[in-house]
């Protein structure tokens, strides 16, 4: 009984940690994308110089929002898993990863179209660290 309870607690905490980590990535990348498109969010800051835009996301706010988002998702998934549907963990996490992939594709595929300048773009790129992102556009 104790082993089964500990196994469930380990499974639940691992799922919560993974869900929070991936949700954090989705949140940061989405915030940068929205900030670059002119939608000012309270937790983002921008600095633009010579064709390079630097965006930062407030770490405390990002962690708080992603933890708040991960709690109900973990609770719903655990409820399904209690009924003997352990595949609920796999299905739920797979959906989160698919959404993460869609957000990444949205940002990286449209990088050059994100460059808002009147000149023709010769080179463009995106660099993402944990809470910082840089979108660079070099004109011809």
Curated annotation (Swiss-Prot):
Membrane-related topology note: Multi-pass membrane protein
Keywords: Cell membrane, Membrane, Transmembrane, Transmembrane helix
Subcellular locations according to the entry: Cell membrane
Gene Ontology CC, one term: plasma membrane
Parts of the chain that traverse the membrane: 12-34, 54-76, 89-111
Name of the protein in question: Uncharacterized protein AF_1249
Organism: Archaeoglobus fulgidus (strain ATCC 49558 / DSM 4304 / JCM 9628 / NBRC 100126 / VC-16)
């Amino acid at each position: 009984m104790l082993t089964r309870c500990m196994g469930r607690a380990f499974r639940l905490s691992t799922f919560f940690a993974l869900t929070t980590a991936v949700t954090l990535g989705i949140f940061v990348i989405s915030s940068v994308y929205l900030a670059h498109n002119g939608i000012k969010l309270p937790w983002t800051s921008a600095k633009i110089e010579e064709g390079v835009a630097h965006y930062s996301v407030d770490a405390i706010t990002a962690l708080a929002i992603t933890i708040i988002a991960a709690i109900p998702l973990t609770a719903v998934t655990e409820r399904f898993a209690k009924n003997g549907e352990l595949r609920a963990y796999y299905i739920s996490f797979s959906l989160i990863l698919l959404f993460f992939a869609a957000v990444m594709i949205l940002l990286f595929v449209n990088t050059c179209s994100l460059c808002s300048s009147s000149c023709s773009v010769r080179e463009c790129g995106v660099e993402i660290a944990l809470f910082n992102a840089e979108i660079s556009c070099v004109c011809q």
